[in-house]
Amino acid sequence: MNTPKELRYSEEHEWVRVEGDKVRIGITDFAQSELGDIVFVELPEVGAEITANEPFGSVESVKTVSELYAPISGKVVEVNEELNDNPEYVNESPYEKAWMIVVEPYDMSEIDNLLTAEQYEEMVKEG
């Protein structure tokens, strides 16, 4: 399982990368491997407001459809349109090519509520 140390993680298997006053969000390597081959990704529009712990989109795999949960509240300022034509990026490159949205957080301190890489790995091990 690939778990980059510089990221923060939600219990719902999303990752967060802080980039100045914004955050980039995607799903973890563990999540994509559990889902199997991703065939469709549904993401919010730029300008949408997302709320921490609430659904903001979904990923569809050959096995199932799974909701994406916002790890932080804020306004969507960028969406990875590449995933419309290339949903397989989620399986191939969950932390780079397959980022999903960029958000301008309402309260950056919400990041402190997220898990470190070590905490996330421990949570996954415990099941």
Curated annotation (Swiss-Prot):
Cofactor annotation remark: Binds 1 lipoyl cofactor covalently.
Pfam families xrefs: GCV_H
Superkingdom of origin: Bacteria
Keyword Chloroplast: no
Annotated Gene Ontology cellular component terms: cytosol; glycine cleavage complex
Cofactor(s) needed for function: (R)-lipoate
N6-lipoyllysine modification, residue list: K63
Domain Lipoyl-binding positions: 22-104
Family annotation (InterPro entries): 2-oxoA_DH_lipoyl-BS, Biotin_lipoyl, GCV_H, GCV_H/Fam206, GCV_H_sub, Single_hybrid_motif
GO terms of biological process kind: glycine decarboxylation via glycine cleavage system
Keyword terms, alphabetized: Lipoyl
Family per similarity comment: Belongs to the GcvH family.
Entry-linked NCBIfam families: gcvH, PRK01202.1
Subunit record text: The glycine cleavage system is composed of four proteins: P, T, L and H.
Entry function: The glycine cleavage system catalyzes the degradation of glycine. The H protein shuttles the methylamine group of glycine from the P protein to the T protein. Is also involved in protein lipoylation via its role as an octanoyl/lipoyl carrier protein intermediate.
Name the record gives this protein: Glycine cleavage system H protein
Organism (species): Geobacillus sp. (strain WCH70)
Source organism phylogeny: Bacteria, Bacillati, Bacillota, Bacilli, Bacillales
Gene coding for it: gcvH
